[in-house]
A protein has these predicted regions:
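Generic detector of short, well-ordered, non-transmembrane alpha-helical segments enriched
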Residues: 15-16, 90, 155
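Aromatic- and Gly/Pro-rich amphipathic surface segment
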Residues: 57-73
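Bacterial Sec-dependent N-terminal signal peptides
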Residues: 1-22
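Primarily secretory-pathway and cell-envelope proteins
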Residues: 20-61, 113-185
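Beta-strand residues in well-ordered beta-sheet regions across diverse protein folds
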Residues: 8, 44, 77, 97, ...
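Mid-length scaffold segments of soluble, non-membrane domains
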Residues: 69-114
C-alpha cells in the first residue's frame, strides 16, 4: 500500500510533463495573405514534405482527387471575384482540391470548406469552379508543398502550386479598374 502511495505523485508528475511537451507537425501549417489590386486573398494549408518519396503517382496517385495538402482542409478566401479566363470565382471561402495526372492538373474550388481532408462523399454540385493547368517540370526539387500567389499586377496574379519537381499555375484577373473608377466618381 505504501508503494502505491509513493508512486501516485510520480504518476501525476509524468502526466503533467507529457501534457506540456509540444512537438512540431510533420506537415506544418502554411498561410499566405496577399493583396492583389483591391482584393484580399488568403490561402491556408498544411505543407507535407517529399521525404525521399516519389510524390506524384505514388504518395498522391494520378487521376484521384486529392485534398491539396495534409491535415485540415486547404482553404482559399477572397474578398473580390477572381476571373480565371471565362470563369469567375465569387467572393467567399472555398476548400481547394486537385486531381493531378502526368501531364496536367485539375484544381477544384469546393463550396464546403470545413471538413477535414476529403469530403466524406464528393458532391459535384459543390464545385464552384474547376480549372485545368499543364504541368511545368522543374529542374530542382521543392521539398515541401508550396502554394503561392505570384506575378502580382494591378489587376492580376497567379496561384502557383509547387511540390517535388512539379509546378502548376492558375492565372486570374480582377475587375480593379471599374472599382477604382466607381470610387473616384463617389
Amino acid at each position: 500500500m505504501m508503494k502505491k502511495l509513493i508512486l501516485l505523485p510520480f504518476a501525476f508528475i509524468t502526466i503533467q510533463l507529457n501534457a506540456q511537451i509540444q512537438m512540431p507537425k510533420a506537415s506544418p501549417l502554411g498561410k499566405i495573405e496577399q493583396k492583389v489590386g483591391l482584393a484580399d486573398i488568403s490561402i491556408s494549408y498544411s505543407r507535407p514534405g517529399k521525404k525521399n518519396r516519389e510524390v506524384f503517382g505514388e504518395v498522391v496517385p494520378f487521376g484521384e482527387t486529392w485534398r491539396l495538402g495534409a491535415n485540415e482542409n486547404t482553404k482559399i478566401t477572397t474578398s473580390e471575384n477572381l476571373i480565371f479566363g471565362k470563369d469567375t470565382l465569387k467572393v467567399g471561402t472555398y476548400g481547394l482540391y486537385a486531381k493531378p495526372s502526368k501531364e496536367m492538373w485539375e484544381l477544384y474550388f469546393y463550396t464546403e470548406s470545413t471538413n477535414w481532408g476529403m469530403p466524406e462523399k464528393w458532391d459535384d454540385s459543390k464545385v464552384a469552379l474547376r480549372l485545368k493547368s499543364n504541368i511545368i517540370n522543374l529542374n530542382t526539387i521543392v521539398e515541401n508543398l508550396t502554394i503561392s500567389i505570384d506575378n502580382l499586377q494591378f489587376d492580376a496574379a497567379t496561384i502557383s502550386i509547387s511540390w517535388d519537381k512539379t509546378r502548376v499555375e492558375f492565372p486570374f484577373q480582377l475587375d480593379t479598374k471599374s472599382k477604382v473608377l466607381a470610387s473616384i466618381k463617389k
